[in-house]
Swiss-Prot record:
Native organism: Salmonella schwarzengrund (strain CVM19633)
NCBIfam families given in the database record: PRK10254.1 (NF007607), unchar_dom_1 (TIGR00369)
Protein name: Proofreading thioesterase EntH
A molecular function GO annotation: 1,4-dihydroxy-2-naphthoyl-CoA thioesterase activity
One protein family per Pfam: 4HBT
Cellular location(s): Cytoplasm
Lineage: Bacteria, Pseudomonadati, Pseudomonadota, Gammaproteobacteria, Enterobacterales
Assembly information from the UniProt record: Homotetramer. Dimer of dimers. Interacts specifically with the aryl carrier protein (ArCP) domain of EntB.
């Protein structure tokens, strides 16, 4: 297991109360040895005006996963902030849920890079993101 902080899924989800994460309906669903996953509904909260998943909502899910994964790699007195987010949208999604899968690309003492892939309910890749974070403190 790569994580330096050991939180349960319930504890991870509790951090989202009264935030954008909760408003968008994002829920952490899996914390594996080197992976963090979450789901987000595709509904009125996350649609753009034409009834498709908004690219900004996809980016919010990606940044949520990468930032929390980065936080799990810190020690007491440290936090992480995102410095760069890149998102490539591959497929439109109009309903259901998307699942985000976050894996580390680089875990340095001060800089981290995370790959976050979003899948629709049929398991098709709909968005690929990369998040860079900086460890502070």
């Amino acid at each position: 297991m790569i994580w330096k902080r050991h939180l349960t899924l319930d504890e991870l989800n509790a951090t989202s109360q009264n935030t954008l994460v909760a408003h968008l309906g994002i829920v952490y669903t899996r914390l594996g040895d080197d992976v963090l996953e979450a789901e987000m509904p595709v509904d009125a909260r996350t649609h753009q005006p034409f009834g498709l998943l908004h690219g900004g909502a996809s980016a919010a899910l990606a940044e949520t996963l990468g930032s929390m994964a980065g936080y799990l790699m810190t020690r007491d007195g440290q936090c992480v902030v995102g410095t760069e987010l890149n998102a490539t949208h591959h497929r439109a999604v109009s309903q259901g849920k998307v699942r985000g899968v976050c894996l580390p690309l680089h875990l340095g003492r001060q800089n981290q890079s995370w790959e976050i892939t979003l899948f629709d309910e049929q398991g098709r890749r709909c968005c690929t993101c990369r998040l860079g974070t900086v460890v502070m403190g």
